[in-house]
UniProtKB/Swiss-Prot annotation:
Gene3D superfamilies: 3.30.70.60. Binds together with bS18 to 16S ribosomal RNA. Residues 104-115 have a biased composition (Basic and acidic residues). It comes from Tolumonas auensis (strain DSM 9187 / NBRC 110442 / TA 4). NCBIfam families: S6 (TIGR00166). The keyword rRNA-binding applies. The keyword Nucleotide-binding does not apply. The lineage of its organism: Bacteria, Pseudomonadati, Pseudomonadota, Gammaproteobacteria, Aeromonadales. Residues 98-124 are annotated as: Disordered. GO terms for cellular component: cytosolic small ribosomal subunit. Keywords: Ribonucleoprotein, Ribosomal protein, RNA-binding, rRNA-binding. It comes from the Bacteria. GO terms for molecular function: small ribosomal subunit rRNA binding; structural constituent of ribosome. This is Small ribosomal subunit protein bS6. Pfam families: Ribosomal_S6.
Amino acid sequence: MRHYEIVFMVHPDQSEQVPGMIERYTGAIKAAGGTIHRLEDWGRRQLAYPIDKLHKAHYVLMNVEAEQSVIDELENNFRFNDAVIRNMIMRTKHAVTEASPMLKAREERPRREDVREEAEEAAE
């Protein structure tokens, strides 16, 4: 089996469907004997350029190990799902399991609530 990195972008109005989509796609991979090494839901992010007059999209990253037939089926599902506005499937040399730089940056960034609480404590 080969290793793949899959990124797909979902229409921002369809963000509530993302958990179901992830479950459906991961289920198809696991049912065919594949494994999922990394799954990250990056949430809504600003696009670098407008796509179909959209400026934001919901991003999902997966690193999987699967047969080519599973990847073909997944690509076919992306193509016929109107909620998926873009997708990219790249073959990689080995399994990637560590957190992506995007997720690391998000975890390192202080949350708004934490910053607000610290500001209130400093004001007292």
